[in-house]
Amino acid sequence: MSKKARPPIPTLDGKIIETHCHLDYLSGDELAGTINKSRDVGVEKIITIAVSEENQAVVREIAESDPNIWCTQGLHPHEAASWSAAFGQELRSNAAHPKVLAIGEIGLDYYYEHADPNTQIAAFEGQIAIAVEHNKPVVIHTREAEEDTKTVLSSVSTALSKKGVIHSFTSSLDLAEFCLSEGFYLGFNGIATFKNAENVREVIRKTPIERILLETDAPYLTPVPYRGVPNAPFYLPFIAQTVADLKQVSVEELLSVTYQNSLDCFF
């Protein structure tokens, strides 16, 4: 689809919380413009996600700059080799920051070999322990690691009182059912609009609307009809419409329920 053929971005008739994006890829006027444009289409709050040792402070600074932006702290599984006792102490301190809502993006990713499984598991478990200490939810990334994800979550879900979300869910229905049974939310994004993502759409159809969170994972995974350009929170209306259609509810109902889900999970 050419740029000229792309439809305008709808303005949502309801509030929405962007539960997962990476605003640290933007700065200056581009960051300000993205935030303003997102508000114009109905995005009320934005959660920007930490992934590496280097960007912990950056996302906190972005959150501090705006009353409706919040953040997380944690190491992505690709960055698991950075996990150490010293980083753990830093994370404990940062978790108490008033704009830090959750520990994440943490988890397991065996699709890429950025860190070996044992290193990833150690970082995952260590960061979950800090979430338990601070009564924070977790933002989990899992890819090609279903059994180890189940094993880790089975051992901690009782202690993890606020649970959290399996973000950008693309795994099996079996893992979805397990995570739901353990009390976690599932996060869905532009992948749901992709032609070859029928597996994700099937999980959405079978996930109770009360357990769904909406996200973009910007600047990645831009939804159709804007696929091919950098993603941003202001594309959430296309994701909301797709999920509403799959759940056979109005966009207004979806927004009402997922807004409350987001509050319950993070705030």
Regions from the PLM with identified roles:
Residues M1-F267:
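Mid-domain alpha/beta scaffold segments of enzyme catalytic cores
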